[in-house]
């Protein structure tokens, strides 16, 4: 099948969540065969910011679901949403 690039929007539990620390904790729970290709912080509203990650997903069974479930279980994560799927460039 090859690699797929999934852009994921991770919403923190609050405005005081350290997004750099959150990114490190998310990297630590990545399933085998997945890797982070890029990241950025996106302002949402009223001081709240989201962490956007581009995750390369290889031939993982279940596609992006194992990554979404792993990210959602990390303390400090309010929600995980896949916003875009495509081939890495």
From Swiss-Prot:
The lineage of its organism: Archaea, Methanobacteriati, Methanobacteriota, Stenosarchaea group, Methanomicrobia. PANTHER family: ELONGATION FACTOR 1-BETA. This is Elongation factor 1-beta. CDD domains: EF1B (cd00292). SUPFAM superfamilies: eEF-1beta-like. The keyword Protein biosynthesis applies. Pfam families: EF1_GNE. The keyword Ion transport does not apply. Keywords: Elongation factor, Protein biosynthesis. It comes from Methanococcoides burtonii (strain DSM 6242 / NBRC 107633 / OCM 468 / ACE-M). Belongs to the EF-1-beta/EF-1-delta family. Promotes the exchange of GDP for GTP in EF-1-alpha/GDP, thus allowing the regeneration of EF-1-alpha/GTP that could then be used to form the ternary complex EF-1-alpha/GTP/AAtRNA. GO terms for molecular function: translation elongation factor activity. InterPro entries: eEF-1beta-like_sf (IPR036219), EF1B_bsu/dsu_GNE (IPR014038), Transl_elong_EF1B/ribsomal_bS6 (IPR014717), Transl_elong_EF1B_B_arc (IPR004542).
